[in-house]
Amino acid sequence: MSAKMYYDRDVDTQVLENKLIAIIGYGSQAHAHAQNLRDSGFNVVVGLREGSSSKAKAEQAGLRVASIEDATKEADVVMLLIPDEQQPAVYEKSIAPHLTAGKALAFGHGFNVHFGRIKPPADVDVFLVAPKGPGHMLRRVYTDGAGMPGIFAVQQDASGKARDIALAYARGIGCTKAGVLETTFKEETETDLFGEQSVLCGGVTHLIQAGFETLVEAGYQPEIAYFETLHEVKLIVDLIYEKGFEGMRHSISNTAEFGDYVTGPRIITDQTKAEMKNVLGDIQSGKFAESFIKDAESGFPYMNEQRSKMRDHTVEKVGKELRDQMPFINKKELEV
């Protein structure tokens, strides 16, 4: 049975009328949520820590800014959109003391609730709304009059209206224009982490890096290797995004399609899939969450080491030089 998609026509936004929504943070997702909700006619306040460099940006966008504590006190719905590793401490210090009965606590990702790092009181609603794309794109498609697909979930329904509130929120940021699916905190967290690690981030970047290194080590020009293993990825992914695998294969040459069939299984083997299952197991057991939290609490020594190593890789240096010569690439839209 196909999963049900919810659209604008399925949502009654009256549940959020005359309510105040606090967006905690003003990063990639938060700036888009705040501006989209405001432009949809909802009352919004942005909660930021004292001295936050984001205050000027939020105010420049025409948004009211308050401390996290004051925003939580005032608001009926509190959406926590700061980095996962920062949420528990901010929640305990600045949100929990002011999260009174009848309010709703919302998330863009289920990580901290699912892994027990944030435990909301029983007398508040708890839900998540997660657009399936980066914040700058969420904002762009909204201003273009379109929407971005998303998912929503209810963890706790103290008011009996948590689901309606979640859907109204999803409509406010533009997701129900494209359609939203209902899920659970468990499913959203585990599938999101798996997708990021095995395919979207870990899988893609390491596949590109291995391909680039193979060509360069064989004596080919790094610039040519960059075009063949990294630059053209977007062209293929865009075809898959718009038309699926079949549509993509219809759009490429017979040579490329034949190579796809005979070589793909040599790169992504049964062993690769078996390792993907191990990765999923580490996510489900909480092992990945533990390692992430441990690194975060130590100041991210492992992650900073990896960032430094990747920054010095030839593919990054060559890529920067080539991208600087491509005026059609919009670099500013990635800035928050």
Swiss-Prot record:
Keywords annotated in UniProt: Amino-acid biosynthesis, Branched-chain amino acid biosynthesis, Magnesium, Metal-binding, NADP, Oxidoreductase
Cofactors: Mg(2+)
UniProt remark on cofactor binding: Binds 2 magnesium ions per subunit.
Domain KARI C-terminal knotted as annotated: residue spans: 184-329
Reactions listed under catalytic activity: (2R)-2,3-dihydroxy-3-methylbutanoate + NADP(+) = (2S)-2-acetolactate + NADPH + H(+); (2R,3R)-2,3-dihydroxy-3-methylpentanoate + NADP(+) = (S)-2-ethyl-2-hydroxy-3-oxobutanoate + NADPH + H(+)
Signal peptide: none
UniProt binding sites for NADP(+): Y26, G27, S28, Q29, R49, S52, S54, D84, E85, Q86, Q87, G135
Database matches in InterPro entries: 6-PGluconate_DH-like_C_sf, KARI, KARI_C, KARI_N, KARI_prok, NAD(P)-bd_dom_sf
SUPFAM superfamilies: 6-phosphogluconate dehydrogenase C-terminal domain-like, NAD(P)-binding Rossmann-fold domains
Domain KARI N-terminal Rossmann: 3-183
Active site: H109
Keyword Magnesium: yes
EC number(s) given by UniProt: 1.1.1.86
PROSITE patterns assigned: KARI_C, KARI_N
Protein residues bound to Mg(2+) 1: D192, E196
Entry annotated with the keyword Lipid biosynthesis: no
Residues binding Mg(2+) 2, per UniProt: D192, E228, E232
Cross-referenced NCBIfam families: ilvC (TIGR00465), PRK05479.1 (NF004017), PRK13403.1 (NF009940)
Primary role: Involved in the biosynthesis of branched-chain amino acids (BCAA). Catalyzes an alkyl-migration followed by a ketol-acid reduction of (S)-2-acetolactate (S2AL) to yield (R)-2,3-dihydroxy-isovalerate. In the isomerase reaction, S2AL is rearranged via a Mg-dependent methyl migration to produce 3-hydroxy-3-methyl-2-ketobutyrate (HMKB). In the reductase reaction, this 2-ketoacid undergoes a metal-dependent reduction by NADPH to yield (R)-2,3-dihydroxy-isovalerate.
PANTHER family noted in UniProt: KETOL-ACID REDUCTOISOMERASE, MITOCHONDRIAL (PTHR21371:SF1)
Record family assignment: Belongs to the ketol-acid reductoisomerase family.
Name of the protein described by the UniProt record: Ketol-acid reductoisomerase (NADP(+))
Lineage: Bacteria, Thermotogati, Deinococcota, Deinococci, Deinococcales
